[in-house]
Amino acid sequence: MGCAGTRIIDLRPDDEKAINEVAALLVEGFKEHSPDSWPDIESALEEVQESLGADRISRVAVDQKGTVLGWIGGLPHYAGHVWELHPLVVRPEHQRKGIGRALVADLEEHVRERGGLTLWVGTDDEDGSTTLSGVDLYPDPLEHLARIRNLRGHPYEFYQEMGFVIAGVMPDANGWGKPDIHMAKRV
């Protein structure tokens, strides 16, 4: 990782400081592109608490002082064969320094250890960041998907660089013209 001394550890249920930092990071990290995801600290804290379940993976990147720089979660589907990456967030001032990549790689390793075969992520476009947003994807969503272009730094290209492929799209997942782009990779 680009930040010296950064390490990735489990987010523990007894680490109230880290839990609160992660919740604040969720609100801050998603407010520009997906403001309804976690609009307030209460909804973010609920999401973080859910991530601490025994069947879940919840990992944080922390600096030398223990400050949370990023968070990633994973939850099992299909009897544990498929895991969902949900969510991934990195402090804005620490983005593009390898923390997100390290968190994804770490999650992949934990998914493999638990017998997972596939990791998938839904990466919403609620703000016109791709050519899939603001249009009617019916009657042929796959035709639109085949011509997808990134207009404003949508993270689907980050995931492609991490080995994910676009596996589908859910039209109108977040309201009319606001799709969820489904991406997956074998681990």
Role assignments for model-derived ranges:
Residues 112-151:
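Conserved GNAT acetyl-CoA-binding A-motif
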Residues 9-86, 91, 101-106, 110-114, ...:
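Acetyl-CoA-dependent GNAT
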Residues 98:
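Conserved G/P- and acidic residue-centered "switch" motifs that form tight phosphate/ATP-binding loops
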Residues 42-43, 127-128, 174-176:
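Short secondary-structure capping/turn micro-motifs that flank functional sites
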Residues 88-95, 123-127:
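A short, internal acetyl-CoA/4′-phosphopantetheine-binding micro-motif in the GNAT/acyltransferase core
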Residues 2-7, 15, 140-187:
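C-terminal "cap" of GNAT-fold acetyltransferases
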